[in-house]
Regions:
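Short beta-strand-to-loop elements that line the ligand-binding cleft
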Residues: 45, 64-74
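Secondary-structure junction motif
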Residues: 41-63, 127-131, 135
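Beta-alpha-beta core module
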Residues: 2-16, 30, 76-124
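Extended ligand-binding regions for polar small-molecule ligands
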Residues: 36, 120-142
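Short loop segments at secondary-structure junctions
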Residues: 22-26, 123-125
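Thr-Gly-centered strand-to-loop micro-motif
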Residues: 22, 45-46, 91-92
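Generic preference for hydrophobic
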Residues: 8, 19-20, 43, 68, ...
Length: 142
């Protein structure tokens, strides 16, 4: 990302990276997922994870060596397929709301992989009044 084109505010929170899976998946019995646990399980991987080296660094090998069944931009579609029993997905913890009655669960990676969170917008952006007020409120409260 060319950050010269954007303004941003670092948010005072991080998100944790892990695997979204069904509760009846054998890996769901683990508290945390280690690279050697992945084996040949079918996984969904976000496009962004293919471009960066965070996931391959955690794995200790190329992401392409995974049994990757598909890539995605938004976790909602893979979440629906995972719910039906088709694989697992590498994702951030807070991207998917998992109700108590859901058959899905999230397990964090170990060693821990965290991401800083940012609010980002184009430089010189013309905002609507509500958007301007929102941004001012965020800036004052962070």
């Amino acid at each position: 990302v060319d950050m010269q084109k954007y303004d941003y505010i670092k948010l005072p929170a991080n998100d944790i990276f892990g695997l979204l899976m069904r509760k009846d998946c054998p890996l769901a019995q683990l508290e945390k997922i280690h690279p050697e646990d992945i084996g040949d399980y079918p996984v969904f991987v976000a496009h962004q994870q293919l471009e960066g080296n965070v996931l391959s660094g955690w794995l200790g090998r190329d992401v392409q060596s995974l049994n990757m069944i598909a890539t995605f931009n938004l976790i909602t579609n893979p979440a629906l397929m995972i719910e039906k029993g088709l694989g697992m997905a590498f994702t951030f913890d807070n991207l998917v709301r998992i109700p108590e009655e859901s058959n899905l669960c999230f397990r964090p990676l170990e060693p821990k992989v965290e991401a800083e969170l940012y609010l980002v917008w184009k430089k010189f952006q013309m905002f609507t009044k509500p958007a301007e007020l929102f941004l001012e409120t965020v800036q004052k409260n962070i």
